Amino acid sequence: MLKYNLKISSRFEHIHDGIASILKNDVPPEAEPIYMDRNTVYRLAINNTPIVIKSFQVPNLIDSYMQTVIGKSKSHLSYLNAKRLQKLGFRTPAPVAYGEVLNGNRLLRSYFMTEFIRGGDLRGWENNPDNEPLLRAFAAEMAKMHEAGILHRDFSQHPVYRHAGSRVQLLPHRP
């Protein structure tokens, strides 16, 4: 029998039904894929509220056990990390929700959702004529994180967002 775990931030309770539908029915076809690799990231508007959905890869049996019986799922940890980053004053998209679909103790699917923010990731940063201010902003943000006791473990191009100029935001999936 399937079990659904869903935690929604109070600020986003108005889209509860749409989020619950994702958990029960998977990401809807109208969601726009914006990043596809091991995990898939989608953009979707629910009741005119734009959100980002990270659909985590289905874990193997051992990882599933580790994420449900011994520890927390990646979606749950992402949600907690986002809350922690915000509490410490770091710029990160507001966490909307996390959800898990389980069959007994086996994790079948998990999702982490944040507010949608406009910007771009760091792909192609080396060809950007404004890359020095961007790199300085990135380094300053990392230094602040390290001073706060946070070691960000995912420096691939996707989890670091840049905005016009040199403002940097971190996606909270793996600090």
Per-segment meaning from a language model:
Residues 1-31:
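Juxta-kinase regulatory segment immediately upstream of eukaryotic protein kinase catalytic domains
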Residues 131-135:
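Short alpha-helical scaffold element within the canonical Hanks-type protein kinase domain
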Residues 158-175:
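Catalytic activation segment of kinase domains across protein kinase-like and atypical kinase folds
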Residues 53, 153, 173:
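Active-site flanking residues adjacent to catalytic metal/cofactor-binding acidic residues
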